[in-house]
């Protein structure tokens, strides 16, 4: 497992312990609220994260602090890659593979996942080098 995968796994494991719940139907919503010992009209006591995912409202500050810390750790790992051939390359290679670039050829999906734009990549030699190296696998 490379550096990017280790950090991604570490962040996923921490996120998984956060206590979020999913409810995409009324029945599941009621069940979720019951599991939290809340009435179905206690809407002010929950926070909607999107994609049918909820957390308790009291956990919102801790959740966003965790997400911000994850973002900073990722940015630090990018900054510490002096050439773009380490963490940055691993990051692009992993996400290209994960998002089926070989078949879809949708770089925008990969960049959205990484919260990057083509402008950022083109203006940063390390990012450009890492992406170019990762894309070589898909050249025909």
Task: List where the protein language model places each region.
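Soluble, non-transmembrane alpha-helical interaction regions
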Residues: 1-140
């Amino acid at each position: 497992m490379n550096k990017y995968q280790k950090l991604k796994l570490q962040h996923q494991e921490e996120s998984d312990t956060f206590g979020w719940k999913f409810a995409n139907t009324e029945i599941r919503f009621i069940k979720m609220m019951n599991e939290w010992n809340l009435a179905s009209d206690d809407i002010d006591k929950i926070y909607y994260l999107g994609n049918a995912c909820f957390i308790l409202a009291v956990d919102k500050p801790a959740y966003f602090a965790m997400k911000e810390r994850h973002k900073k750790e990722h940015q630090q790992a990018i900054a510490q890659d002096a050439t773009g051939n380490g963490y940055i390359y691993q990051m692009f290679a992993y996400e290209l593979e994960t998002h089926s670039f070989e078949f879809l050829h949708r770089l925008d999906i990969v960049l959205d996942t990484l919260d990057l734009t083509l402008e950022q990549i083109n203006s940063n030699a390390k990012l450009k080098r890492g992406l170019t190296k990762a894309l070589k696998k898909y050249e025909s």
